[in-house]
Amino acid sequence: MLSHIKYIDLFAGIGGFHQAMDSFNAECVFASEWDKDCQYTYEENYGIKPYGDITQIHEKDIPEHDVICAGFPCQAFSISGKQQGFEDSRGTLFFEIARIAKYHQPKILLLENVRNFEKHDNGNTLHIVKTTLEETGYNFFYKVLNASNFGVPQKRERIFMVAFRKDLNVTSFIFPSGINSPITLQDFLEKKGIDEKLIIKRDDITLKENIKIKPDMFGHYPQKPIRIGTVNKGGQGERIYSPLGHAITLSAYGGGVGAKTGLYKIGDTIRRLSPEECRRITGFSKKFKLHPKPTVSYRQFGNSVVVPVLKSILEQILQNNILKTDSLKAAS
């Protein structure tokens, strides 16, 4: 396990990185998150109240650590945003990570951002990150991974970046490809106690006729969202999907009656997903305590990293014996 490893959790959100690192028994020695609601959820679950604005924290005041975890703010690079990148103050927060890494020289940086980060500004944004970390003393690797391939029924494509301190002599790193798991959204749904507010009752619901969703020869359904209808004009947040496929990407923002979770035909009803179902398809543990306000929970999971993807990356790092541990498996 990673019981001898100390890490810091920057732009911590509700602790997706914490969930993954904790499953290997690593020790969180510092967390930072400016959002008050996320601070509340983080402290409720991990007993640590994150510090606020990282730009106001001197690197000397941060404890020594082996790993930096950071899902740095993505709105500046998101397809759904204005894509201003480093021109947006949120985009420049990457350099806070570099500042801390330069001072502390941890062994590994584990970073995450939206898929569009790879292509933003014709690849220049990613190039700046790569060059900055290389100049800080690291070998840099990245890959876009889809959560659908890692045991959760949510299409969520994100770029994952791993940087190894150069003296570790990691000259190549192969990211995990995922697992072949025949799961569907239906497997992750709550069976009872669904809030009536989640159900959509409207006259402008249109379902495609004679749709037959069949498994393949191995009994597996398509590992992607399957659209089967619309509400209103079928714009973003107005599309209906089958639970026999995967969920669309959870979103912190967006409009439409199905905003943030999408709409699904479950039995005879059309409804949004519950906060508990969002927890499940993001891979957070059963013990995780949701924020008491559903609207806040939706936003938090819409911004979160998917935990099983991080676990797989960590296992890949361990298989390379980079952190010299005695176990390759995360706790369940």
Across the structure, where does each feature detected by a protein language model lie?
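Class I S-adenosyl-L-methionine
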Residues: 2, 57-67, 77-249, 255
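Class I SAM-dependent methyltransferase "Motif I" SAM/SAH-binding loop
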Residues: 9-14
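Glycine-rich SAM-binding Motif I of class I
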Residues: 15, 19
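A short, Lys/Arg-enriched amphipathic alpha-helix followed by its capping loop at the start of a domain
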Residues: 20-27
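Conserved SAM/SAH-binding beta-strand->alpha-helix loop
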Residues: 35
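Conserved SAM-binding loop
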Residues: 42
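Conserved SAM-binding strand-loop segment of SAM-dependent methyltransferases
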Residues: 47-54
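C-terminal target-recognition/interaction regions appended to catalytic cores
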Residues: 207-332
